[in-house]
Design a protein with these regions (language model features):
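Interface amphipathic segments
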Residues: 1-215
Length: 215
C-alpha cells in the first residue's frame, strides 16, 4: 500500500466464487489500456490463473516469449505469483537481449508482504569474461511527508567476475525525495575490500567516502 497509493478506477466487487481462467493476448492493446504501459510484443502472451474469492487468494502464471518495454527487449519471460499465508510468493525468469545494454539472464524468487519485498536474484551476463552471482536483499517501502521512501537492505551475496569472487557484505541504502544515502556498502575478496558511505544526491554539500584496501 505504501508503494501504490492511487485508487482503482474500476469498481471493486467481492464474491465467494472459485474459478480458473486462461487468456491469450495476441497484442498488448488491452494490457496497455489497463496498466497504462507502453508494452509491445512480437508473440502472443499467455496468462493462466486460479482465483479463490472467499479466501482472497490468487495463483497467476504469465508466459511472454518476447516483449519490449521502453526500449528494453525481454525474452522468455515466465512469471508466477501465488498467494500464501505469509504473503505473495513470486518467481520470475527472463532474458534481457537486444542492441541496447548487456545480455542478461535472470532468475529470481521473492516474497511480497507488509510493504516489504524480500528477494533472491541470480543473474548471469555471458561473454568472454562472464559476470554472474546472486543478490539477496529486502526492500521496504513507507511514506514520509507524503512521498515514497525506500530502504534497501543487502544481505550477504556474491558477484563473480570471471574467476574472481566478490562478497557483498550487509549494508543499507535508502532513497527519499532525490536523497540517496549509502550506509557501509562493501565489496570484499579475502583481504581486499571497497567500502562506500555517504549521500550522493547532487547537493554541493554531499559527499561519498570510499575506502580501498589492497586493491
Amino acid at each position: 500500500p505504501s508503494l501504490i497509493q492511487a485508487k482503482s478506477q474500476y469498481p471493486l466487487s467481492y464474491g465467494k466464487a472459485n474459478y480458473a481462467f486462461t487468456l491469450r493476448l495476441n497484442d498488448t492493446k488491452l494490457l496497455n489500456s489497463l496498466l497504462k504501459t507502453p508494452i509491445t510484443s512480437s508473440h502472443a502472451m499467455r496468462l493462466t490463473g486460479i482465483v479463490r474469492e472467499r479466501q482472497h487468494e490468487l495463483d497467476l502464471n504469465v508466459n511472454a516469449p518476447d516483449v519490449t518495454y521502453k526500449g528494453q527487449q525481454i525474452k522468455k519471460l515466465l512469471l508466477n505469483i501465488n498467494s500464501e499465508p505469509q504473503g505473495l510468493v513470486t518467481t520470475i525468469s527472463a532474458e534481457r537481449k537486444g542492441e541496447q545494454g548487456p545480455h542478461i539472464l535472470i532468475n529470481a524468487q521473492g516474497l511480497i508482504a507488509d510493504n516489504t519485498i524480500s528477494s533472491d536474484i541470480s543473474f548471469r551476463i555471458p561473454g568472454l569474461a562472464p559476470i554472474y552471482g546472486n543478490i539477496n536483499s529486502e526492500a521496504s517501502f513507507s511514506r514520509l511527508h507524503g512521498d515514497l521512501k525506500t530502504r534497501l537492505h543487502l544481505n550477504p551475496s556474491k558477484i563473480n567476475f570471471d574467476s574472481i569472487t566478490l562478497q557483498v557484505q550487509p549494508s543499507d541504502i535508502s532513497y527519499h525525495r532525490n536523497y540517496l544515502t549509502i550506509d557501509h556498502f562493501e565489496l570484499s575478496n579475502n583481504n581486499q575490500h571497497i567500502i562506500a558511505n555517504g549521500q550522493p544526491s547532487g547537493n554541493q554539500n554531499d559527499s561519498i567516502l570510499v575506502r580501498f584496501k589492497d586493491v
